[in-house]
Curated annotation (Swiss-Prot):
Signal peptide: none annotated. It comes from Oceanobacillus iheyensis (strain DSM 14371 / CIP 107618 / JCM 11309 / KCTC 3954 / HTE831). SUPFAM superfamilies: TTHA0583/YokD-like (SSF110710). This is UPF0340 protein OB2986. It holds the Pfam family DUF436. Belongs to the UPF0340 family.
């Protein structure tokens, strides 16, 4: 795998997100990522700070273009806790948990995010408006109801499958309800 290929795959996905125009300023965007899967290895076996760095940089460009708030999911060893900026935890009254993600417990991506955010904290859970799962890390528990899968053309980042989702409000009221557009 070359860093150029990885960056190109990510740029394609970032472009698809921005072209879709579904992300709004201040939306929470959850990212689950196995850098091992990106490298073509089984999840949890070959975490890579270099891969995490490239992914983080490209996601920052998505953040800059859309105004979203990034949230990074840790691995199952930290119960899929979430790394966010302290301002997000405070704004949404998210209780902080006592853990610092590292490559071996939390995962390389969450550890990298924790090391490079301005004032990071780890929270137990979050309810995001959208998200991206790189390498089948199971982000569904952190998405608002109702999750709507997005079918982007770019389906892989190197070897890792990518799944993207947005959310929509529940439709309530039954057959008499009017939902507009």
């Amino acid at each position: 795998m070359t860093n150029d290929r990885l960056a190109q795959d990510l740029k394609c996905i970032v472009k698809e997100w921005t072209d879709a125009r579904i992300l709004r300023e201040n939306d929470i965007f959850v990212v689950g990522c196995s850098t091992s899967e990106v490298a073509g290895q089984p999840i949890g076996t070959a975490g890579s700070e270099e891969i995490a760095s490239t992914i983080y940089q490209q996601l920052q460009s998505l953040q800059n273009a859309t105004g979203i708030n990034l949230a990074f999911q840790c691995c199952e060893h930290l119960n899929r806790a979430i790394v966010v900026e302290r301002t997000i935890a405070t704004t949404y009254s998210l209780p902080e948990v006592t853990a610092i993600p590292v490559r071996e417990a939390g995962g390389a991506m969450a550890a990298y995010a924790y090391q490079h955010m301005i004032d990071p904290v780890v929270v137990e859970k979050i309810t995001a408006e959208a998200g991206m799962d790189i390498g089948e890390t199971m982000i569904g528990m952190h998405l608002k109801h109702v999750a709507v899968p997005l079918k982007f053309k770019q389906r892989f980042i190197n070897y890792a499958r990518v799944r993207a989702a947005r959310t929509r409000p529940k439709l309530v009221g039954g057959s008499r309800a009017y939902y507009g557009k």
